[in-house]
């Protein structure tokens, strides 16, 4: 069945593979469950969670402005109450075909590819989608240049959606052990080594670093 246009959003936990390797399957599975539940609680009216794919969620949001605001809430608020990890988001607006509750087509493919190039804490969208909401209050768009995305015929200009108040903010630091992006305000531990401060997602990561600082600082 042909679907009316909507914004498709893909969001996942930055560095999730490294987290699984460092902390094990049980903690990783618990993190995924918490992530999906937090995302569900943030959905605006009319939006739906289409499915979960590993640590990622696929969402359908009727309005592109609401989708961008949702993405910004996820990168700032989802997981912040209990966890220190960063979320990355990619989205694109357009038509798709619905089959058994799932959605297919070029729009969905572009949204997924855009999410794959986002950094932790970043909300990326296409120029076409950003142009639909030029006056979204408190939000600005910064070009990230043109990108060639897998299985997308033409290069697309990609934009980062930013809260006006956050413009110029530094990127999130990375846990040197598990390579997870870490929110400094929620980091479980921090250590200084040779003049550099390192932030950690967990006490085990901090302990690993303390035992072998040369190995992890070099990485």
Which residues make up each language-model segment?
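Intrinsically disordered, glycine/charged-rich C-terminal tails and inter-domain linkers
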Residues: 1, 128-218
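Catalytic NTP-binding/metal-coordinating core of nucleotidyl cyclase/transferase enzymes
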Residues: 1-69, 77
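Catalytic beta-strand-to-alpha-helix segment of the class III nucleotidyl cyclase homology domain
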Residues: 3, 58-168
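A conserved hydrophobic position in a structured secondary element of the catalytic/binding core
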Residues: 11, 62, 125, 200-201
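Conserved short hydrophobic interaction patches
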Residues: 38, 77, 114-117, 208, ...
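Short secondary-structure junctions
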Residues: 42-46, 81-83, 183
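Short secondary-structure boundary/capping segments
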Residues: 49-50, 115, 189-190
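Structural motif
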Residues: 53, 99, 193-194
């Amino acid at each position: 069945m042909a679907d009316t246009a909507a914004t498709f959003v893909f969001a996942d936990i930055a560095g999730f593979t490294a987290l699984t390797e460092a902390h094990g399957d049980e903690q990783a599975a618990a993190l995924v469950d918490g992530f999906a539940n937090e995302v569900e609680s943030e959905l605006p009216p009319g939006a739906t969670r289409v499915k979960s794919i590993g640590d990622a969620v696929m969402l359908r949001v009727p309005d592109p402005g609401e989708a961008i605001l949702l993405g910004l809430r996820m990168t700032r608020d989802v997981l912040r109450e209990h966890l220190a990890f960063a979320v990355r988001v990619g989205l694109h607006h357009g038509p798709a075909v619905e089959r058994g509750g799932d959605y297919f087509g070029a729009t969905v493919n572009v949204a997924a590819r855009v999410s794959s190039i986002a950094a932790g804490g970043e909300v990326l969208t296409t120029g076409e989608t950003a142009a639909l909401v030029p006056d979204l209050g408190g939000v600005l768009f910064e070009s990230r240049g043109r990108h060639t995305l897998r299985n997308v015929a033409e290069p697309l200009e990609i934009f980062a959606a930013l809260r006006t108040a956050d413009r110029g903010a530094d990127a999130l630091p990375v846990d040197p052990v598990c390579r997870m992006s870490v929110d400094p305000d929620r980091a479980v531990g921090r250590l200084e080594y040779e003049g550099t401060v390192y932030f950690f997602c967990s006490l085990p990561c901090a302990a690993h670093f303390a035992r072998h600082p040369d190995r992890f600082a070099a990485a």
